A protein has these predicted regions:
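Flexible, solvent-exposed loop/hinge segments and secondary-structure transition points
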Residues: 1-138
């Protein structure tokens, strides 16, 4: 069962998570857009690295919102969809983004927001999102 919601993430902590995600992207030579949202899915912080495709802006925000609103990584939706059959129902969920790269941000066992990245392959987006999430784990 997913963690409960806690007090929403603030700007300073959101910037810290984004900075860790961007550092991971830079080390690997990837250009990314990163979005951090609060528990309601509202944007708290956003940054687009130089040379990031503009389409990644909306995708990063969507991944972050999905992870916050559904309390799970977007990869969970990707995996369900890949299974086909009843998993295709995920396409009918408003706000679901079935592509890896969105991860809930958890502090003290409670979801405080989520981070979403876009710009690379979905596995690269996920790797950077997890780096951002790992930066705030208490």
């Amino acid at each position: 069962m997913p963690e409960p919601y806690g007090a929403p993430i603030g700007a300073n902590e959101a910037k810290k998570a984004a900075a860790a995600a961007i550092a991971e992207a830079r080390v690997n030579g990837w250009a990314m857009a990163v979005a951090v949202v609060d528990t309601g899915g509202f944007l708290v912080y956003f940054e687009k690295m130089d040379d990031t495709q503009t389409g990644s802006v909306a995708v990063a925000i969507g991944k972050a919102r999905c992870a916050a609103l559904f309390k799970r990584p977007t990869k969970a939706f990707q995996d369900v969809l890949a299974g086909g059959g009843d998993g295709l129902r995920v396409l009918g969920l408003e706000g679901a983004v079935p592509v890896e790269g969105g991860v809930p941000l958890v502090r003290d066992g409670k979801i405080v927001g989520a981070i979403g990245l876009s710009g690379g392959a979905s596995s690269q987006d996920g790797q950077c999102a997890r780096a951002g999430a790992d930066s705030i784990v208490a």
